[in-house]
Amino acid sequence: MAIIPDKQDSSVLERKEQKLKPPSMYKVVLLNDDFTPMEFVVMVVQEYFKKDRETATQIMLKVHREGRGVCGVYTRDIASTKVEQVVTHARQAGHPLQCVMEEA
């Protein structure tokens, strides 16, 4: 014996559209100090931010002259990872180079 419902459900579920927004972006910024060699800064920019030597040198000079230089703009997780990698590498090499992230 089959159970048959008294009423058929004729309602239609409406699909709610989710508005997706792009992820927040963050600038990764190197800060100047009086002790980290310029060549080390160039190497860091080339290695961790995949910049060519000329671009890396320009970023290093901006850090040297203006006190800070943007190495790139990334999503939060990537920016955070790059900051950690740069600071860790600098400490292991005995340099006080600072790297921070700021909302773009």
Swiss-Prot record:
Signal peptide bounds: none
Q: Which domain of life is it from?
A: Bacteria
- GO terms classed as biological process: protein catabolic process; proteolysis
Among the Pfam families in the record, one is ClpS
Give the matching InterPro entries: ClpS (IPR022935), ClpS_core (IPR003769), Ribosomal_bL12_C/ClpS-like (IPR014719)
Which cysteines pair up through disulfides? They are: none
What does the sequence similarity comment in the record state about its family?
Belongs to the ClpS family.
Q: What does this protein do?
A: Involved in the modulation of the specificity of the ClpAP-mediated ATP-dependent protein degradation.
- Report quaternary structure and partners: Binds to the N-terminal domain of the chaperone ClpA.
What is this protein called in UniProt? ATP-dependent Clp protease adapter protein ClpS
Species assigned in the record = Burkholderia mallei (strain ATCC 23344)
**The organism's lineage?**
Bacteria, Pseudomonadati, Pseudomonadota, Betaproteobacteria, Burkholderiales
- Which gene does this sequence derive from? clpS
